[in-house]
Regions:
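Structured-RNA-binding interfaces characteristic of tRNA pseudouridine synthases
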Residues: 1-253
Length: 253
């Protein structure tokens, strides 16, 4: 039965961002949000409210575990059928894993308590990793990079690692570390929030540490300077993955 009351549904999805101009819908460029909205309008209602994502990924950035919510008038929506139809409709580089009814107070962006990103650095040239990992051939000191990563933990002003100015640049970074898997160096970072371009700039600055262009004291000074021009280069977007978003346990996702 359809009523005037809107009911909220959560979508869990993954996407390869190489051919998209980020998550947020744009007039003249393909985006993840735009593609999903086309599908919802086609299968549900042209007047469906805008789908809301867990964050605004930049152009070229990928997501392994991304969440979004939308509202619809019918709480008895056949989510299995919609899941099947959307996956047939959407391009191959976007996949919907699940669609579930969720409580009305849930918000894909503002209910999140943390987000985790991973950045992939390939130490070996690999044609199958084009637009999926950053190839870097020089040897890096992973131990030094992890010592520097540990300095990021806690409530930190992260304005040194962002292109944009914020009234509040404090981020609560809960974990930050590097690990190696075969020919891949992977940087993992989890925080309650991220500033624009923050992860890519942190990775570039940590690479400078690994190359011994800067030492640990320099890295501390960069953090405390609150000045983007003191930090290192921003690595390419295509090596960055939003790997997870965490929500309070009361939301069964």
């Amino acid at each position: 039965m359809q009523t005037s009351q809107l009911h909220k549904f959560i979508i869990r999805l993954s996407f390869l961002g190489a051919n998209f101009s980020g998550w947020q819908i744009q007039n003249n460029a393909p985006t993840i949000q735009g593609e999903i909205m086309k599908g919802l309008h086609y299968f549900l209602d042209r007047k469906s409210p805008l789908i809301v994502g867990a964050g605004r990924t930049d152009a070229g950035v990928h997501a392994i575990n991304f969440f979004a919510h939308f509202e619809f008038y019918n709480q008895y929506l056949d989510t299995n059928n919609l899941l099947y139809n959307l996956n047939r409709f959407l391009p191959d580089n976007i996949v919907i894993h699940s669609i579930k009814l969720v409580s009305s107070d849930f918000h894909a962006r503002f209910s999140a308590i943390s987000r985790k990103y991973e950045y992939l650095v390939s130490t070996k040239k690999d044609p199958f990793l084009i637009n999926r990992a950053f190839y870097f051939y020089k040897e890096l000191d992973l131990e030094l990079m992890n010592l520097a990563s540990n300095m990021l933990l806690g409530h930190k002003n992260c304005s040194s690692f962002s292109k944009s100015n914020y009234d509040n640049s404090i981020c609560n970074i809960q974990s930050a570390y590097w690990f190696k898997s075969k020919n891949m160096l992977i940087f993992s970072i989890e925080s309650n929030r991220f500033l624009y371009n923050m992860v890519r700039c942190i990775v570039g600055t940590l690479i400078d540490v690994g190359l011994k262009k800067i030492n640990l004291e320099d890295f501390t000074n960069i953090i405390e300077s609150n000045n983007r021009s003191n930090a290192g280069f921003s690595v390419p977007a295509y090596g960055l993955y939003l790997s997870d978003v965490k929500y309070p346990k009361k939301y069964i996702l």
